[in-house]
């Protein structure tokens, strides 16, 4: 492990000093290589799927694991889009001249070696590797065991392009020891690794947080809420509920809980019921919502659960303050939305809700680097320091101060 990480650290200088044009050429070559290797990648992914099904994996986890032609094409296209993004390095973030004439610039630089720990989705391998490469970083990737063959295939394709361009293959590499013990070692290797980014469930986040001596940016669960205020426009609210819950229930920016003001709950839920029935949504509700929607009684645990399935908690609240209190208790600081035509209530919601992304009259499904207009992301950070929300290439940089003098000495 130590020898492997030492090579990764050594590779960081070569990657950090590449010219932007050269970096983009290599990324485009990687995208082409992914397309050309489609058959090989799909064959090994089929083996992963077969083994996962035999081990009892099902539902959203299988959906995340599965690759097909369009997904491979999407992976390649994402790499090309990353190549087209503005160079995140060497940006003068701030600059000033102090009284003694020193000119100071705050300039963006690579972080160094980034360890990324994730589950199920093989496309995360290509996305995160490309983002790290574009931002001048070396990445050490640890995917889920269920996607082992798929991740190895994708990484090997990208490494072959590095090798063909006389660059160290350690710039994009998979952690050689993917066991729990291996992860525990990785997150303590602060002499070689500069940042750890875990994205996954509670168990993974807790394990990394408890064991790491390296700075961690958490990409925790998405316990997202949609609140229907008493002054909501139903024509907006109804399709937003359906989109936010049912378009892709397995993703972290899908809602898990719907909150509805008591003054409008009967009218609104009666209109919503046939739409949810059409989508086959399972309801877990409070006493008032169950009278209209049917379903099971929601438990305390349900409100703390990221289902990743087409299951929706529904709770009727007395008003704005109770909705905010519920979100504060059960939310994971990911994405929260209010539907209202009341401007002052909307502004209060935006100011008072503590989350990385807060919406008015829109679906939480937009919390995504591509939808925000800055390309693919490493994940959605629920941490508050350094990066929050979709973590793109700019969040994969740090900064240094460049100081220009003309012989000044401190007195």
From Swiss-Prot:
Q: Which UniProt keywords apply?
A: Amino-acid biosynthesis, Cytoplasm, NADP, Oxidoreductase, Proline biosynthesis
The GO terms describing molecular function are:
glutamate-5-semialdehyde dehydrogenase activity; NADP binding
One Pfam family linked to the record: Aldedh
Tell me where on the tree of life, at the top rank, the source sits.
Bacteria
Fetch the InterPro entries from UniProt. Ald_DH/histidinol_DH, Ald_DH_C, Ald_DH_N, Aldehyde_DH_dom, G-glutamylP_reductase_CS, Glu-5-SA_DH, GPR_dom
Involved pathway(s): Amino-acid biosynthesis; L-proline biosynthesis; L-glutamate 5-semialdehyde from L-glutamate: step 2/2
Which EC number(s) are documented for this chain?
1.2.1.41
- What's its catalytic activity? L-glutamate 5-semialdehyde + phosphate + NADP(+) = L-glutamyl 5-phosphate + NADPH + H(+)
PROSITE patterns found in the cross-reference section: PROA (PS01223)
- Which GO biological process annotations does it have? L-proline biosynthetic process
What is the main EC category here?
A: oxidoreductase
> What is the protein's known function?
Catalyzes the NADPH-dependent reduction of L-glutamate 5-phosphate into L-glutamate 5-semialdehyde and phosphate. The product spontaneously undergoes cyclization to form 1-pyrroline-5-carboxylate.
Q: Which PANTHER family match?
A: DELTA-1-PYRROLINE-5-CARBOXYLATE SYNTHASE, GLUTAMATE SEMIALDEHYDE DEHYDROGENASE
Family statement drawn from the similarity comment of this UniProt entry: Belongs to the gamma-glutamyl phosphate reductase family.
* Entry protein name: Gamma-glutamyl phosphate reductase
